C-alpha cells in the first residue's frame, strides 16, 4: 500500500471522497467529511470537524475544537484560534430543517480569527483581517486588513500583512 503524503492520527476519520494536500496533518479525534478539500501544509488540531464540501486553502492552521460547517471556505494561510465558531444558519431550530437556508462564509487569505470568536454565517472576512478573541462578527463584510473586536464586532483599527 502506498504511503499517503499527509498525516492522519489513528483516532481521526477522513471520509471518501475528499482531497487532502501533501504535508497536511490531521490530529486526534478530528473528522473530515466527504467532498472536503484541504490544501497542502495545513494543520488541523484535535477535535476539528470539516463539513461536507468545505474548502480549506494552503497553509491553514485550525486549532482544537473548531467546526467548519458546510458553506465555510478558508483562503490560504488562514489562522483559526481554539474553539472559534462558524455558524451556517441564521436562526436554527431543532424541529425545522433549514439546510436549504445555509449561508456561505468566506475567509480571505492570511486572515486570523481569535480564540472563541463567533462568525455568523453569510459573512465575508477580508484578506489579512484580524478578528479578536471572543468577538462576534455579525456584519456581512469585514474589509481587508480590518482589526475587529467586541460583541458585536466593530472595527477597532487596521492591521498589516505582518500583524
Model feature map: region roles:
Residues 1-7, 13, 46, 55, ...:
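Glycine-rich hexapeptide-repeat left-handed beta-helix
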Amino acid at each position: 500500500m502506498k504511503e499517503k503524503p499527509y498525516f492522519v492520527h489513528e483516532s481521526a476519520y477522513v471520509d471518501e471522497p475528499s482531497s487532502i494536500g501533501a504535508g497536511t496533518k490531521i490530529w486526534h479525534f478530528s473528522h473530515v467529511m466527504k467532498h472536503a478539500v484541504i490544501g497542502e501544509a495545513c494543520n488541523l488540531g484535535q477535535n476539528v470537524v470539516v463539513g461536507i464540501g468545505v474548502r480549506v486553502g494552503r497553509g491553514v492552521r485550525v486549532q482544537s475544537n473548531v467546526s467548519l460547517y458546510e458553506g465555510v471556505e478558508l483562503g490560504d494561510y488562514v489562522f483559526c484560534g481554539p474553539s472559534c465558531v462558524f455558524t451556517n444558519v441564521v436562526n436554527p431550530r431543532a424541529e425545522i430543517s433549514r439546510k436549504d437556508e445555509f449561508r456561505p462564509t468566506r475567509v480571505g487569505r492570511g486572515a486570523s480569527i481569535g480564540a472563541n470568536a463567533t462568525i455568523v454565517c453569510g459573512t465575508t472576512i477580508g484578506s489579512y483581517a484580524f478578528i479578536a478573541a471572543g468577538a462576534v462578527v455579525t456584519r456581512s463584510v469585514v474589509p481587508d486588513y480590518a482589526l475587529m473586536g467586541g460583541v458585536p464586532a466593530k472595527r477597532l483599527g487596521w492591521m498589516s500583512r505582518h500583524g
